Amino acid sequence: MENGIPALLIAAILMLSTVFMARGGFIGMDGVAQQLRTSETAIGAQNRTALTVTGTAIDATGANITITVLNSGQTDVSQYSKMDVVLQYFDDTAVLHNVWIPYTSGPLAANTWTTGTFTNDVFDPRILNPGESMQILIRVNPVVGKATTNKAVIGTDKGVTVQTLFSGPP
């Protein structure tokens, strides 16, 4: 009898510790599974997102660049503030500029970009749905040099990028 009560107590402690350890493992695995589901959703959205540059233009001053992109993917693009526009261009004195251009929803200022005209914008106004085109209006300072070859890289919030070359003003 004197060994029975301590043995029962030890057995109960072992059972409780086994239950708590198993519970901790299950909770950890559940967290990992939820993160994997979230990651799979994000990767799926990234795989279904695609942009195609259909045109570029620059005004005579070299300050205003227009890039037209077509949503050739299967998901919409709507979070413009989370998009990246990076320019690599030469100015009038042949100095190379590598510039990240932030989005603005207000008036276009120097070294900012905004959305312009949407083409085939049937559903969801001002959201770039599949099959629709949008103008990206960019203003830079210093201005793009005449007769230079320059590059623009556009990245969506889902991590998909497209790049294009554009010429400076004639």
Predicted regions and their residues:
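Terminal connector regions
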Residues: 30-31, 139-170
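Asparagine-centered strand-capping/turn motif at beta-strand->loop junctions
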Residues: 68-74
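Membrane engagement elements in two modes
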Residues: 1-54
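A short beta-turn/strand-edge loop motif at beta-sheet boundaries
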Residues: 74-79, 144-146
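Short strand-edge motifs at loop-to-beta-strand transitions and within beta-strands
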Residues: 124, 132-138
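Short, solvent-exposed loop/turn segments enriched in Ser/Thr/Gly
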Residues: 60-66, 146-150
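The feature marks short-to-medium sequence segments in extracytoplasmic or secretory-pathway proteins
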Residues: 76-128
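Surface-exposed loops/turns
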Residues: 61, 129-130
